[in-house]
Amino acid sequence: MTKNIQVLFVCLGNICRSPMAEAVFRNEVEKAGLEARFDTIDSCGTGAWHVGNRPDPRTLEVLKKNGIHTKHLARKLSTSDFKNFDYIFAMDSSNLRNINRVKPQGSRAKVMLFGEYASPGVSKIVDDPYYGGSDGFGDCYIQLVDFSQNFLKSIA
């Protein structure tokens, strides 16, 4: 029998992109009827600025508009994540560098850009929408749905 999969999404502060990725991915898993394939779907940040906080209101707004809800509270990446997760997906190149900088030697986690699962013509980098307007959050949502669907196809 195939081992269940643990997936972690990582951005900078864990209030915009990664909690959206977690919620979108969970939704896509449910829509595909693949819940039994996953033990853990979570998100965190490389920084600790927002630990314990709910996602940015604009993240919650985009999720709600698309019928997705989350109860996520921000947390920081920890060394235990590298042994507890099969995939650690970074939202951008800076996140990826920061994750790899603290990755313990011998880690079992596959660390990569979530955007490696982008469809042709879709940017692999999920830009941080924090300092922009609501449009950036909508753009993130579109990318994250695309990446999620393609990742799920890749493991089917």
UniProtKB/Swiss-Prot annotation:
GO molecular function, one term: non-membrane spanning protein tyrosine phosphatase activity
Pfam families linked: LMWPc (PF01451)
EC number: 3.1.3.48, 3.1.3.2
Keyword tRNA-binding appears in the UniProt entry: no
Catalytic reaction annotation: O-phospho-L-tyrosyl-[protein] + H2O = L-tyrosyl-[protein] + phosphate; a phosphate monoester + H2O = an alcohol + phosphate
Gene3D superfamilies the UniProt entry points to: 3.40.50.2300
Cell compartments where the protein resides: Cytoplasm
Record keyword Cytoplasm present: yes
Positions of the catalytic residues: 11 (nucleophile), 17, 128 (proton donor)
GO BP of this protein: signaling
SUPFAM superfamilies linked to this entry: Phosphotyrosine protein phosphatases I
Cellular-component GO terms for this entry: cytosol; nucleus
Keywords of the record: Cytoplasm, Hydrolase, Protein phosphatase
Family: Belongs to the low molecular weight phosphotyrosine protein phosphatase family.
Functional summary from the UniProt entry: May contribute to dephosphorylation of 'Tyr-15' of cdc2.
Official protein name in the record: Low molecular weight phosphotyrosine protein phosphatase
Gene: stp1
